[in-house]
C-alpha cells in the first residue's frame, strides 16, 4: 500500500520540458534563449505583474528549445514550453537562505514567495502570495488541510509523515 511506502527520489530525466505557464493567470516573459546554460533555480521567465508567476529551471543544463509542446493538462492542447537538456550535475544557482524569517517584514516574505513562483496545488494554481496576502491581518485561525481528495492518493500523507518539521516551520511563517 502506498501509504506505507516512503517517498523516493526519481533518477534525473534525460530531458526536461518546462511549461511556461504553470499557474492561473498569464505566462511570464521568457528571459532565456536557446543555447543558454542555466542552473537549478535560475529564472526561465520574469513576472510582469501579480497574476503571473516566474518559472525556474528544475536542474542545470542547456536550453535546447523554446516552443509549442503538448501541455501537461487534460485538454491535450499545445502551450509554450522550454526544453532543457540536463548536464547531469544538478547544480543550484547561488542561493541566499533566510536564517530567521522574523527579521523580514510580511511584505518582504510575500515578495520572496512570489519570486519563487509558488502556486497553490489546487486545479486553478493561484499564486500563493496572493492567497496569503488576502488573509494578512484579517485571520485569527489557520486551518491546515492535510486531507487527500481521493481515498487512494497518499502523497500528502507521506509528505506530512516524512517532512513534518518543514511543514511546521511553514506554518510558523504563515502565522507570522
How does the language model describe each region?
Residues 2-7, 41, 68-71, 130:
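Intrinsically disordered, low-complexity boundary segments flanking structured domains
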Residues 15, 35-38, 141-148:
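Active-site-adjacent bridging/hinge elements
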Residues 48:
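Cationic-aromatic interfacial patches
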Residues 52-176:
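Iron-sulfur-associated redox domains of electron-transfer enzymes in respiratory
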Residues 28-37, 41:
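Short histidine-centered loop motifs in beta-beta connectors
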Residues 1-31, 83:
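N-terminal, Lys/Arg-enriched amphipathic/low-complexity engagement segments
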Residues 38-44, 63-64:
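Generic structural signal for buried aliphatic residues
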Amino acid at each position: 500500500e502506498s501509504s506505507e511506502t516512503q517517498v523516493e527520489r526519481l533518477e534525473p530525466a534525460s530531458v526536461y520540458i518546462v511549461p511556461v505557464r504553470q499557474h492561473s493567470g498569464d505566462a511570464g516573459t521568457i528571459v532565456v534563449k536557446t543555447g543558454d546554460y542555466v542552473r537549478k533555480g535560475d529564472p526561465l521567465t520574469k513576472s510582469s505583474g501579480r497574476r503571473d508567476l516566474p518559472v525556474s529551471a528544475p536542474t542545470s543544463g542547456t536550453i535546447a528549445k523554446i516552443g509549442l509542446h503538448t501541455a501537461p493538462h487534460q485538454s491535450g492542447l499545445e502551450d509554450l514550453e522550454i526544453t532543457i537538456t540536463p548536464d547531469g550535475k544538478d547544480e543550484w544557482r547561488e542561493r541566499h537562505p533566510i536564517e530567521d524569517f522574523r527579521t523580514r517584514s510580511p511584505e518582504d516574505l510575500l515578495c520572496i514567495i512570489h519570486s519563487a513562483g509558488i502556486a497553490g496545488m489546487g486545479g486553478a494554481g493561484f499564486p500563493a502570495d496572493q492567497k496569503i496576502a488576502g488573509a494578512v491581518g484579517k485571520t485569527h485561525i489557520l486551518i491546515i488541510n492535510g486531507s487527500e481528495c481521493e481515498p487512494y492518493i497518499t502523497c500528502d500523507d507521506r509528505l506530512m509523515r516524512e517532512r513534518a518539521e518543514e511543514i511546521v516551520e511553514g506554518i510558523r511563517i504563515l502565522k507570522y
